[in-house]
Amino acid sequence: MNMPLSLMQFAPALPEIFVLAMVSLILVIDAAVGDGKRYLAYGLSLVTLAGAAFLTVRDFSTLPVLALGGLFIDDPLSDVLKLFLYLTVAIVLVYSRDYLRVRGLYKGEFFVLALFALLGMMVMVSASHFLTLYLGLELLSLSLYAMVALQRDSSVATEAAMKYFVLGALASGMLLYGMSMVYGVTGSLALGDIAIVLQDGTDLRIPLVFGIVFVVAGLAFKLGAVPFHMWVPDVYHGAPTAMTLFVGSAPKIAAFAFVVRVLGQGLESQVSEWRDMLVILAVLSMAIGNIAAIAQSNLKRMFAYSTISHMGFMLLGVLAGSQNGYGAAMFYVLVYTLMTLGGFGMILLLSRAGFESDRLDDFKGLNRRSPWLAFVMLLLMFSMTGIPPTVGFYAKLAVLQAVVEIGYVWLAVAAVLFSLVGAFYYLRIVKLMYFDTPQDTAPIAPGIDARLLMSANGLAVLALGILPQPLMAVCVQAIGTSF
């Protein structure tokens, strides 16, 4: 039986439609049940992720398919990134469950906001039009603003949310202004049409360059790249750790998709205009991120500056402007997400009622309290540093190879030097865990599911480091087939 054309147009967006329907259902159910049945929202959220993953795998696209009048694209890049988004959000929910429960935050609002944010990210990775990109971005951003402020009785969280909102609104305005200037030059908001017009050349070089500058500035804010990084440390530190884990993981995958769609597809012919801007952003991010992280005594702020430096590293792959470069950047952002889940997840597992395990001193002597969790954290820190045989080493190597291929050897050397600086604060945590006396002697009792997931998280960092080729091949093939 053939579906009408109008319904066929919606077929590639079935995962998004399913998530939206389930969010609406969770809202209704959560409003109807009492506080004692909040686990329903948690369970239904995991069911939503599993259902969306099933639909994505069932209709996995091997070739790009435009839908909804060219506003939406279903291609291997979007499908692969969506699957990683589902996995990331599921891990966040499992890690966060006990943390939220003991702090009175185990409510439907968190799960609804998480799924709305996921929906925004799904729209972003499948957008082939500036309007769709912006719609997905704003849905994600508004969900994150509310999520950061969810702990209403915390003045620190409220302050962080206000900073995030004000700076985010400014960045969104810059991005929208840049899009309007590109539209003024090309006469289109569709990325494919923009690419065709710019390949033929244009006499309006100055407006186009200004438009690209504003677009890149808006993208840099969403990534947390220097000098648009001011919100990152305050939001990571001020928000409850469960919210920090969400903000610091899945949205980076969507931000990568945004960057590669806009720069790698729509503005591909203008690589000479945006490459130098990305070089500056990457160098500043690696420098300031790594140097500022050394001075931090709070682990969440340290990870915030670490994120800034990692985004600088990821931009190295993007500025290469090649299939290998984009593939390396995609591999890097997926690996970064895996490491971030483990790092913040460890803070969640070690925290308990009335105690936030977010200071460096809280990790002193962890090997005596829980040798296995200390070993998992060691693997995560080694991977963030880039020490073989963990996957962080291969991710950095792939990005550096892409940069060297375009002749930017000096940039690769600078990246290696900044990585050596970053090794100090990562290995400091290892030293605290294995050579210092524990200050906290309370038993560590995470749930069995969280403990198993953390173990898998750490071992995945090691396994992907030993066998990185399959995931790298998926990334390069997804980029090559989609572009």
From Swiss-Prot:
- Keyword Signal in the entry? The reply is no
- Keyword flag tRNA-binding: no
Q: Which parts pass through the membrane?
A: 13-33, 39-57, 76-96, 110-130, 131-151, 165-185, 206-226, 240-260, 277-297, 302-322, 330-350, 373-393, 406-426, 459-479
Which cysteines bridge via disulfide bonds?
none
What domain of life does the native source organism fall in? Bacteria
Q: What does this protein do?
A: NDH-1 shuttles electrons from NADH, via FMN and iron-sulfur (Fe-S) centers, to quinones in the respiratory chain. The immediate electron acceptor for the enzyme in this species is believed to be ubiquinone. Couples the redox reaction to proton translocation (for every two electrons transferred, four hydrogen ions are translocated across the cytoplasmic membrane), and thus conserves the redox energy in a proton gradient.
Family, per entry: Belongs to the complex I subunit 2 family.
PANTHER family according to UniProt: NADH DEHYDROGENASE
Q: What is this protein called?
A: NADH-quinone oxidoreductase subunit N
Query: From what organism does this protein derive?
Result: Thiobacillus denitrificans (strain ATCC 25259 / T1)
User: What gene does this protein come from?
Assistant: nuoN
